[in-house]
Amino acid sequence: MSRRRFAERGSEDSRDGSDRLLREAGERLGGSPPRLRRSGVFVRVLRDARPYAPQIGALTLLSLLATPLALLLPVPLKIAVDSVIGSHPPPGILDAVLPAAATNSDTGLLITVALMFVAFAFLSQLVELATLVLGTHTGERLLILFRCRLFLHVQRLSLAYHDRRDIGESAYRIQWDASNLRDLAEAVFPLLAGLSMFIGILIVTVLINWQLALVALTVGPFVIVVARIYGRRLRSEWHTAERFESRGLSVVQETLSAMRVVTAFGQERREASRFVDRAWAGSHARRRLASVQGMLALLIGLITAIGTAAVLIVGVTQVNSSAITLGELLIVMAYLTLLYQPLEDMGKKVADLQEALAGIERAYSVLDEVPEVQQRRNARPLRRATGEIGFRAVSFAYRQQAPVLDDVWLRVEPGSFVGLVGATGAGKTTLVSLLTRFYDPTGGQIRLDGEDLRNYKIADLRSQFAIVLQEPVLFSTSIAENIAYGRPRADPDAIVEAARAANAHDFIAGLPDGYDTQVGDRGMLLSGGERQRVSLARAFLRDAPILIMDEPTSAVDVATERAIIEAVGRLAEGRTTLLITHRPSVQLRCERILRVDGGRVVDGGRPRAHQSPMPRIRERDMFPGAEPRSRR
């Protein structure tokens, strides 16, 4: 048997980093479900970004530092035109800080202004590099923390939420919508830098020539109005496009997870057509979005071009009248380019911002979902239950549908082996789903060890159960890690012992990689019987006081069924066991049979007698001394 890898759990550094991140994400979620929040997206993002306030502060300073550097870049051009080409004296500050040789001759002055330009450009690029590195680091940390919060929260949501949602939609919101948090940062800081640049250049331009500054400013209100009008349309279009894309992803995931069925029925073209329909709808939404973006960029570009032309006309007129020098006009035109550049970029930045806001709103809508199954504030811990189960007048219906269970009274003694039988859809699986608090009953009370389930902490309650499903659920990892899924830190010897108890060790040891064997997606590299025995081994290792099995032998051959039944017998020893099955051979292993029929539970007695007429379980039989509930 190979133990080369299955005892490993990844590198310590990686695991420690993941643990820290999960703890931080869990702390941000808090111990209770989040309440619906109505604060603005920006406010929520800022609140979530508080752990990275120092980095965000540094990014803000870098954005502000870019403004004076940008203002200095055109200065060498003005000096060269006015003092090297023209006859105007160089600025006095140069004489104060530079040796006379650098300013007394045209050659020295030209070399000086050239070096100034290189120095200013280098510093500007250095600030841009620092902004890129720090921004990427901060954005990625924010993103992975936000994704962890989303993923943890989605797993905490009740099964009723997942019953109503496509897997693809949830995956899209975690993987893609969440990434808009990073995109928002990438859009906000350039806008902040652009605003700082706009103010700085405006001040300098006013100092040079207030008339030209006034002419340049006339386009501002038009740009703001256009950006606001198209900004609302852009966010709406982004919501539409992302909705269609998530639907397309749902089709892909659904089809790939059911490839055997799709291939067996020859429905590849049908599924491709279904995907194309959704992809085409998404493509159409993207084309509409591109049209809106293009129109916004066109209008802003036209407005700034008109502003530039107006400044040029007024500026040339003033040069001809000797009101300003040619160098002053050139520096104003250079500043005007810098002034209008943020406005011209606004089309793209506004589009990026609206895309980010639309995605973040969708992601936050998931965080705003409140689990239907909630933990009470004063919930008590539960170490290990004895396994006594009681249902008192329990009713349940799925979201306004007809009741699946109605007035169920049931008592299971600790350590007993009970079989649940009944027609398909009678409510057997619903019964055990209520016991594990995947759902809460719409009426009545379920008790464990004499205490209402809702009085226990949810995590402690669910740790009392080991579950073996009709269709075994394995993860795309090694056999050992699948067996240890309920006890991730189990030692290798315990894993092997659990496999032996489940009659799985022999086939595992016969595999080339033994317990290190990768099982593939959903365990499809193993046979159905092998998957079921690995699932049983997982239940053995879990060592929970209550065992729930849902048709564990429904899809295996006779020999495999015999091996599984033997393992089930060992697994049930000393545990309260609920076994859902239709097979008489499996029912014979049970101490008692309960039939679920018409939303009620009837007692079938011993296994061999369960086919005879069965009386409905009465509450006074199950709970001596209980008063019958009044009937209407």
Enumerate the language-model features and the residues they cover.
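Membrane-integrated ABC transporters
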Residues: M1-L73, I85-F117, L123, V127-G135, ...
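Juxtamembrane helix-loop junctions of ABC transporter transmembrane domains
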Residues: G30-R38, L61-L62, L69-G86, M116, ...
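An intracellular "coupling" helix at the cytosolic face of ABC transporter transmembrane type-1 domains
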Residues: R50-P54, L159-A160, W176-L184, V188, ...
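Transmembrane helices of ABC transporter permease
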Residues: Q55-P68, F189-T240, V311-I324, Q341
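Hydrophobic alpha-helical segments in the permease module
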Residues: F117-S124, E128, G220-A227, Q293-G307, ...
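Conserved catalytic Walker-motif region of ABC-type ATPase nucleotide-binding domains
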Residues: V154, F275, A363, F391-A393
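Cytosolic ends of transmembrane helices, especially the final helix of ABC transmembrane type-1 domains
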Residues: F244, Q267, S291, L338-V366
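ABC-type nucleotide-binding domain
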Residues: Q375-R376, L382-R632
